[in-house]
Regions:
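Acidic/polar-rich alpha-helix caps and helix-coil junctions
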Residues: 1-29, 64-250
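Short, cationic low-complexity segments
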Residues: 34-53
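Non-catalytic, low-structured ubiquitin/UBL-interacting segments
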Residues: 56
């Protein structure tokens, strides 16, 4: 995985924040590392919706990116007891056990006990560029789109799924899924989900989640996403900011 201390600034990386637990005080690892995965100072607040995981797994069952992206089965760093969440357990009886952790930015050293860690934050990498070029090529219909996607997938021993081999519209849907499979959690999820407009966001993200059958939407552990464009396509400005901004006249 490129998301390790030992594989920082590799040939795929275009821009990384250079971090050190002794200087920059990054709490990324603390926030992403599953509870009790390492010795101390970790919370694992950030998860991936179970249905997003299943879409990825169903599309590419043998994808090595899955283990590099998600964490759902590990041992307690102190007691050695098994710690499992979905899909290692499928009952989904409570929120904590219902969604896998996002493992990319987690601290990988189980003996680590510092509040901060040293793993760099990858801001932009070559795979992101290739997917963008594939998307552009598909819109231009210049015949280059499949080559870019193939380069991304071949590096992990995979080949493009069938959606990339169909029509322009089918390729468009496939590339938007590929952004998610490859880049989830790297800072562009909200933008990528929305940049094709509300209708596309509604049909390919919101309703896909709200009506999913694998593992199945469950009100007690899943968030029902709003279908109101006024609340989903804009980022509300806090009233306190509006009240104190002297450049706003009315």
């Amino acid at each position: 995985s490129i998301f390790t201390d030992s594989n920082e600034n590799n040939s795929e990386s275009i821009f990384e924040f250079q971090l050190s637990q002794d200087a920059t005080n990054s709490q990324m690892g603390r926030n992403y590392t599953p509870l009790n995965y390492k010795m101390s100072q970790n919370f694992g607040w950030f998860r991936v919706n179970a249905d997003v995981f299943e879409i990825h797994r169903n599309m590419y069952p043998n994808d090595p990116r899955i283990d590099a992206t998600y964490m759902y089965d590990y041992t307690h760093a102190i007691t050695g007891a098994p710690q499992r969440t979905y899909p290692a357990i499928t009952t989904r009886t409570n929120v904590r056990a219902s969604h896998p952790f996002l493992f990319k930015f987690a601290e990988k050293d189980k003996t680590h006990s510092n509040q901060y860690n040293s793993q760099n934050i990858v801001v932009y990498r070559y795979a992101d560029l290739l997917l963008m070029l594939a998307e552009i090529s598909n819109e231009l219909q210049n015949g280059q789109q499949l080559g870019y996607v193939t380069e991304v997938l071949n590096r992990v021993g995979m080949t493009p799924q069938v959606g990339f081999l169909g029509s322009q519209e089918e390729f468009r849907d496939a590339i938007m899924n590929e952004y998610r499979f490859e880049l989830i959690g790297e800072g562009e999820d909200a933008h990528n989900n929305r940049r094709r407009g509300f209708d596309y966001f509604l049909n390919n993200t919101i309703l896909t989640h709200n009506t999913n059958t694998n593992p199945g939407f469950k009100a007690s552990v899943d968030i029902l996403l709003s279908t109101d464009p006024t609340g989903t396509m804009t980022l509300p400005i806090p009233q306190s900011e509006i009240n104190t901004n002297e450049l706003i006249n009315n």
